[in-house]
Amino acid sequence: MVRLSARGYRGFVRKDFRDLFTGDFLGNIEVAVLRGGGEAIKDSRVRWAATYPGPGDQVLFIKKFKAKGWKERVKYLFLPSKAKREWDVSLASREKGVRIPAPVGVMERRRWGFLEESLYISEAVEGAHPVTDFFKERLGRDDSKGEEGRRLIRLLGDTVRHIHENGLFHADMHAGNFLIGKGGEEGLYLIDLHRARIRKGLSQRRRLWNIAQLFYSLDSFLEQGDKGIFFEAYGRKETAPSLLMRVERLACRIKRRHQRSRAKRCLKESTVFTSHRCNGYRVFRRRDVSAGSLMEMIGAHREIVENSPWLLLKNSPKTVVSMVEMPHGSTSRTCVKQYRCATAWGKIKGCFRNSKGKTSWVAANELFRQGISALRPLAYVERARFGFLVESFFLMESPADYLEMDRYLIKSFAHGASGDTLLKKRAFIREFARSIGRLHASYIFHGDLKTCNILARERRGGWDFSFIDLDAVHLGTEVSSRKTLKNLVQINCSIPGFLGYGDRVRFLNWYLEIHPIPMAKRDLIKAVLEESRKRGVVYVSPEGDVREEVLSR
C-alpha cells in the first residue's frame, strides 16, 4: 500500500493502481469514470457506485459515500467513515479466509476536519451477479431447476456458517449482498461491509438475526424444505421446529421494520417526493404535483370554509373536510382535510409526535404503494408558529365514482333479490373480505375501520376498495387477535341489516383464508356478536344515520 493525497483526498491505495488515481481523475470522479469507459450502477443523494476498467483486464468497483448533513460530519470526527470501515473489515475478513472482493484503496475528503466524501475501491468480481438476481432470472419456482436451486441454498448455508465462525456480523445480510460468479464454482462473495463488524464470537441471537435477514430477502423463493437444506449446510442437521419458528418471527419483525422505514420515504427527497417551504408552509408533495396547484387547492378550501360552509363534508373544531376541483381544467377532484390545533395542549402534543395529517400522509402513500388503496395522496402541508403546529392540510385524489361502503351496499343490494344480484353480492363480499385480509396480512391496522371510512367502486371484473380517515392507521404492526376482533366488530356494526348472518359468516371465512388468526372460528363469531351487541348497528343511508339491532343467528 502507498499513501495518496490529491485534490483534497487522502488515503491508501495499492501500489499497482497508484498511477490511476490522479488529481484530474479524483477532481470529478463521476465524469472521469464515464469518459474512461466505466459504468455508473448507483447514483443517489448519499451514495454513488460504478465499475471502471483498470490496468490490463482488471475491472474496479468504486463506491463513493456522501456525508448526510452536519450530524454525520460531526459523527465522523470520532468514528471511522463508511469507506474506512469497509476497508478495515474487508482486510480483516480476507485474512480469516472469508471470500471478499479484493480491496484496492480507501480515501477521504475532509474540510476543517469534517468529512465530506469517502471512497472505497475494490476489484470487481468478473461476471458476478447478486444471488437475488440469480434466483429471479434462472430459478423462480420452476421445479425443473430444483436441484440447481438446492445447490445454491447449500452454498449459502455453508458460506454463512463460515462467515459466522470467523466472527463476522453483517448488519445488512440480505441475498443481494452475496455475489455469485460464473457458474458459482468459486463460491459466494460477501459485499457492502460498511455495516459489518468483526467480533470475537457471535451469539446465537446475532446468528439467527442474520439468517432471518437472508430468509426475508428470499421469501418469494424459499419453502420450508429449502430452509431445512440451508440449516443442514449451516451445520444443524436436525433443525428444531422451535428454532425455525424463531427465525420466521425475526423475519416478520424485519419485514415490519422495513415497512415502517420505507413508508417514511414520502418525507424525504427522492425521485417521487420532495419537501420544501412555500409561503410560510412546510410542504411534502409528489413531484408531479406543483406547489402552485397545492396552494390553489388550499385557497379553494379556505374559500368554501369562509363563504360556503354548507358545502363542507365535515366541519368540527378539530377537522374540516372539503372537496375541491383540481386546477388547470382537470376533471379530477381532490379531498382537502384540514387539521386545526386550536388548544394549547394540542400545540404542545404536536411537538412530541407526528401530527394526524402527517400520519395520514405516510399511511396513504404506503397503502397506495402496496396497491391496497387506489386513492393517490398528493401532499401534506403544515404551518407552524414559534415552533408550535398551528394547522395542517392533507390532500388526496377523490374520484367521483367512489362511494362510502354503507352507501354502496344500500344502492347495490338493498332492494335486489334476483339470482344475478345474489351472485354479485356474494362476489362483492368475497372481494371485500380479501381486501381487509390483505390489509391485515400486510401488517397494517386501521383503528377506525367503519364502513363509512371504506370507499368502493365497481370496475370491470371486480371492485376497488380504498380507505380514508387514515390518522388512525398503524404501519408495521402485527395485527393480533384483539386488533382483528376490534376491526371486525367495527365493520359488523356499520353494515346494514339486509346483509344477513350467512353473508357475514362468508365474509369471515374468506377473510380468514388471507389472514388466519390463532382463534377458533366459532369463538371469533361469538366474540364479534357479543361486542357488537354492546354497540349496536349504525350506518349512513341517503335519509341519514340509521340504527338497528345486531343480527343473531
Where is each model-derived feature located?
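Juxta-kinase regulatory segment immediately upstream of eukaryotic protein kinase catalytic domains
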Residues: 1-37, 248-311
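Conserved ATP-binding subdomain of kinase catalytic cores across diverse folds
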Residues: 20-136, 142-143, 155-166, 170-171, ...
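Short, glycine/acidic-enriched loop or turn micro-motifs at the edges of active sites
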Residues: 126, 175, 195, 451, ...
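Short alpha-helical scaffold element within the canonical Hanks-type protein kinase domain
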Residues: 149-153, 425-429
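Hydrophobic residue at the +6 position relative to the catalytic HRD Asp in the kinase catalytic loop
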Residues: 173-180, 449-456
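Activation-loop N-terminal segment of eukaryotic-like protein kinases
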Residues: 180-185, 456-462
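C-lobe/activation-segment region of protein kinase-like
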Residues: 189-253, 257, 463-534
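Terminal substrate-recognition subdomain of acyl/acetyltransferases
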Residues: 240-245, 249-278, 517-519, 530-553
